[in-house]
Amino acid sequence: MADLGPVAWPPEPIRTERLVLREPEARDRAAVIELLASPEVGTYLGGPRPRDELEREMPGAPERRPGLFIADLDGAMIGQVILKRATGFSVPAAAGKAELGYLFLPQAWGFGYAAEACAAALGWLASELPGEPVVLLTQTANVRSMRLAAKLGFTEVERYEAYGAEQWFGMLSPVTPSD
């Protein structure tokens, strides 16, 4: 994973109206495995990962790395938000920019948790790296993700074909402080 750069990590837990964004902990292991093995979650990500493979690869606590937040609702993990440097593999214009990613357990869908968590993570990024442009890539068939991108303020830059499906590349313009 490409590093975000000079950010203070880990930050203090970020509290929203209903959630806490925090670093992964050992208690999140089962939920992370459930998330990555979920057929629903994997629909637009190349399919679910085999549970037995995940069990072997994750012997203890889930990986900790700058930009990886656990979305915690009432003490339980319901998803994760990831901020990392985009590689530009599929979209050269995305290379080097901060990329937003998110995965939530199906039982957490439809309650606005993803929007709340992503907005909080983007707020953290804006305070750490003011003016940083942020990109988001998703399949156009992923209606929920497309709605979330619009709700967060991402605007379409281009559509392209990759992995046998139409993809969407959007950008969140940085907010520049006024003098």
Where are the regions a protein language model picked out?
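A short helix-loop-beta submotif of the ANL/AMP-binding
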Residues: 106-115
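GNAT-family acyltransferases
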Residues: 1-107, 120-124, 128, 133, ...
